[in-house]
Amino acid sequence: RQRQMCIRDRYQRVFVLDLLGTRDVETLLAHAYIDHLRELDETRPIKYYNFDFHNVSRAVGGMEGVGAELDRLHNVQTQRQYYRYTLCTQGKMLERQSGVFRVNCFDCLDRTNVVEGLLSHAALRDFFHELRRHAQEPVCVQLAADTSLPAALWQAHRDLWAGNGDALSNISTGTGLSLIHI
C-alpha cells in the first residue's frame, strides 16, 4: 500500500499494466491486486489493465507479436502518449511527465523487462517525434541537426536496457535474463 501511494504521490497518475496470467495461481494474485488497488484513495484512482503476456505471445507470434499488440492497445497507447516525459533545457521545462506505468508480474523478470523495454522504446520514439514541436529551442535544433544522434541513442537505449535488466535479474535471482537479446 505504501509503495503504491508513494508512486502515485510522486507521479500523480499511475497506469498498472498487469502481466499476470489469467489462469492458475496468477489469477488469484491478479484479483487480490485489483482488490488492493480499489482500497486506495478513490479520489485519484489508479488505472489498471491486464495483459496476459504468455497468452498474447502464444496467440500473436512471440515477442514481435507482443510489441505489435501493445502498439494496438488503445488504452495503453493513450496513457503512454499522455504521460510523456520531462524535457528541460537551460533551466526551462519544455515538457513535464504527468504519469507513470507500473508493470506488475509474478516471477518472470523476462516478461517484465520485455514489456517495460517496449514502453521505453515507444517513449523514445515519441521523444524524437515531438522534438519538432520545440524546433525553436537550441537543444532541439542541435538534436535534430545531428543525424547520427538518433542511431546512437537507439543503440545506447538497447545496451542500457539489456544491461540493466540483466543486472537486476542477477541481483534478484542469481541468473541473467534469458531474453537479453530482445
Please give the residue ranges for each predicted region.
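Short, small-residue-biased leader/transition segments that mark boundaries at the very start
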Residues: 2-7, 182
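C-terminal, well-structured subdomains that either form a transmembrane helix-short loop-helix hairpin
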Residues: 12-21, 89-125
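Carboxylate/His-rich catalytic cores and anion/metal-binding grooves
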Residues: 14, 20-54
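Intrinsically disordered, low-complexity regions enriched in proline, serine, glycine
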Residues: 17, 49, 60, 114-115, ...
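Long, compositionally biased intrinsically disordered terminal regions
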Residues: 23, 35-39, 59-72, 96, ...
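A short acidic (Asp/Glu
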Residues: 25-34, 59-63, 113-118
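A generic secondary-structure signal for well-formed alpha-helical elements
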Residues: 40-41, 77, 109, 113, ...
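Helix-loop module immediately N-terminal to the HCX5R catalytic loop
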Residues: 61-99
